[in-house]
A protein has these predicted regions:
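P-loop NTPase motor catalytic core
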Residues: 1-173
Length: 173
């Protein structure tokens, strides 16, 4: 990818690889030193990733593309304004390398199209969700990070194949 996708996913300097590496580095450095005579206090961090494609009005799970479960945006409760996507799969990962492998596998199913300026312009938005749950003997802390790669900004008229009603026209008339 080029442009926005390269900025988000570039192998060594993309925002997503940098964010995942920084996250796991921080989680690893949070482990307190344990005196030899003491047993370490149970402390764990669970990290999971989800990857959603938004194409027009359609939501697709890029980590479980063959799933028949329809994805829908839902509100958590009447008193909570939090939105979530029901049916979206989530995969637990142990380190940044594993997370990036999962993300790259999912992105292979992302819709792309050749344009005059870019051989593989994304035609959909991709939303990476990273859930972190850190537990020690006194508390559980949950955090969530969203990283979004927007669809290519080329207008449909710049596409080599711009059939009427193509998904690219939904975003880029």
């Amino acid at each position: 990818g080029a442009g926005k996708t390269h900025t988000m996913l570039g192998e060594s300097d993309g925002i997503i690889p940098k964010a995942l590496n920084a996250l796991f580095d921080k989680l690893g450095s949070d482990e307190p030193p344990t005196p030899v005579a003491q047993t370490p206090a149970p402390r764990a961090a669970k990290v999971s990733v989800s990857l959603l494609q938004i194409l027009g009005e359609k939501l697709e799970d890029l980590l479980s593309p063959s799933s028949d479960v329809p994805l829908r945006v839902r509100q958590a409760s009447r008193v909570n304004d939090e939105l979530y996507v029901s049916g979206l799969s989530s995969i637990v990962v142990d380190d940044a390398e594993a997370a990036l492998k999962v993300v790259n596998r999912g992105l292979k199913g992302r819709r792309e199209r050749s344009t005059k300026r870019n051989d593989a312009s994304s035609r959909s938005h991709a939303v990476l969700r990273v859930d972190i749950e850190k537990t020690d003997d006194c508390e559980v802390v949950k955090s969530r990070l969203y990283l979004v790669d927007l669809a290519g900004s080329e207008r449909a008229s710049a596409l080599d194949d711009d059939a009427e009603g193509s998904p690219s026209k939904m975003y880029n008339p």
